[in-house]
Amino acid sequence: IMQRGIVLNEGNRRVILDDGDGSEVYRRKPYTIRTLDPAQEKVDFWMVNDIHARDSVFQLLIKEAPEAQPDFVCLNGDLASQTETEQTLWDACLGSASKILTPAGIPLAVTRGNHENRGAYAQHWLDYFPTPTGETYYTFRRGPAFFIVLDGCEDKPDNDPRYYGMGDWNEYRRQQAEWLKGVVNSDEFRAAPVRIVLMHMIPGKEDSWYGEQQIRRLFVPELAGKGIDLMLCGHYHRYHWIDDGSRGVDFPILVNSNNDCLRVSADAKGIDLKVVNTAGAVIKQHRIDKKNK
């Protein structure tokens, strides 16, 4: 649905009614959404990843969001191990997101993980998470931060027997790399005070799995030296802070575990990161002071 006449950074409502006269929609206040505003001085967002249908863990990780009011929550891949039906996504975490985040007006930013490529219903991913590009890679601006969302695709070669010859992820990564060249040379990217990459998988080392090596070969040359401030990933199911250049990039990479929530606050001066466990305790912290890149 194309909505016109919306106001930046203010609550907006759209109510769609059917013939169900007297249904619950008449008995509750309509939910609101807050539109993106590039003039916003600070952006706060949370990230969870690798839920793999552990909905009870997901609920613990986002339960404080309605009170904290982050600008959005990023679901950074692998919501389920494979998607066989529409119900798979709902049971994995979207049902809880609709009960906890939606009434609070907190939107989602979603990346596709490698496991989202698996299962009979995998091809419907973009039906639930449409993007401005019509692809699983896209960009958006929230406050001072320009976000690049990338799809690392599968972690194994396309000819792996588990894919039944149905995937062409090598070509999809090449397609993204070409698109990425235009993104990092765009006025929108260059004008942003903060630049963050969201991707489920991480650029690899020489001994990494195939997909990670392809990410390094194709994506890293387009990202390194371009003024990226931070990359946020998942996939490993454990925490890593990588700032030693071992992945071929000149910016830090934070890999979030599958049991924690990453809370990020960014403005023109820098980025603050807190890793919070299911009990609500901060277990890791980082500060990135903004440099002129």
PLM regions and their residue ranges:
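Extended active-site neighborhood of metal-dependent phosphoesterases/phosphodiesterases
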Residues: 1-32, 87-188, 218-224, 240-274
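Active-site neighborhood of phospho(di)ester-bond hydrolases with catalytic His/Asp-centered motifs
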Residues: 46-49, 72-78, 106-114, 196-200, ...
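Active-site environment of divalent metal-dependent phosphoester hydrolases
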Residues: 53-59, 81-85, 112-121, 155-159, ...
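Alpha/beta-hydrolase fold active-site loops
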Residues: 42-43, 71, 137, 144-145, ...
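N-terminal active-site segment of His-dependent metallophosphoesterases
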Residues: 4, 8-87
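Generic beta-strand hydrophobic packing signal
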Residues: 31, 73, 231, 274, ...
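A short C-terminal boundary segment appended to hydrolase-like catalytic domains
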Residues: 264-293
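Active-site-proximal segments of metal-dependent phosphoesterases and phosphodiesterases across multiple
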Residues: 163-171, 187-233
